[in-house]
Design a protein with these regions (language model features):
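Glycine-rich loop at the start of a catalytic domain that most often binds anionic cofactors/ligands
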Residues: 22-38
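Short, active-site-adjacent cap segments at secondary-structure transitions
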Residues: 22-27, 81-84, 115-117, 150-154
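Internal active-site segments that recognize and position negatively charged phosphoryl groups
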Residues: 62, 89-154
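Short, glycine/charged-enriched secondary-structure capping and boundary segments
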Residues: 30-33, 90, 123-124, 157-161
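Ligand-binding beta-strand-loop-alpha-helix segment within the catalytic cores
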Residues: 33-115
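Polyanion-binding loop/helix "lid" in catalytic or ligand-binding cores
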Residues: 3-7, 46-63, 121-124, 129-132, ...
């Protein structure tokens, strides 16, 4: 994270950061089946809160790394600002909060989270889905994804025949969907 913060600190462009939950949120979410909504498990509500706390902790670590490089951040917490209609459908994204951060010279930072959901009670809202909505609204010149692998692959990166796709275009994405 410190290396990423160092790289970002050298650029004067405005940008928004969306990060995933990684190992902070995924284990509990999986153990308590949060992706499938509310259920009768009495421990699930505690698991929801614990997952939310852990992804917020990861967010704080990232924001602290940016702060050390003199970058101001504005955290937008999805579980407090967004609601979903199923796992890939954000009811409304609070662009005015992102805009206010950008207007005041801050970097808006948001992340994958457990949100309240109109269809199943709760939902895992991934950072990728948030990113899609932000791209539709802001229409950035480019989006950069940082991940555990050295790029986007044509198939599962653990497959020995997988190949890195050097530049991802709409045509590449169509090919990957097939």
């Amino acid at each position: 994270l410190n290396r990423i913060a160092s790289i970002l600190s050298k650029h004067s462009h405005q940008f928004i950061i969306v990060h995933g939950a990684g190992s902070f949120g995924h284990p509990i979410a999986k153990k308590f089946n949060l992706a499938n909504g509310l259920n009768k498990n009495p421990n699930q509500k505690k698991a929801i809160e614990e997952t939310r706390e852990q992804v917020l902790e990861l967010n704080q670590i990232l924001c602290n790394s940016l702060s050390k490089k003199k970058m101001l951040t504005k955290t937008i917490i999805p579980s407090k600002t967004m609601k979903t209609n199923g796992p890939k459908n954000i009811e409304s994204i609070p662009t005015e909060i992102f805009d206010k951060g950008l207007e005041t010279g801050k970097i808006p930072v948001t992340f994958g989270d457990v949100t309240d959901d109109n269809l199943q009670g709760i939902c895992i809202l991934s950072g990728d889905v948030i990113m899609e909505e932000l791209v539709k609204h802001y229409k950035p010149r480019m989006s950069i994804f940082v991940m555990d692998y050295p790029g986007v692959f044509d198939r599962n990166p653990t497959d020995k025949d997988s190949q890195i796709i050097p530049v991802v275009t709409l045509q590449t994405l169509k090919m990957l969907k097939e």
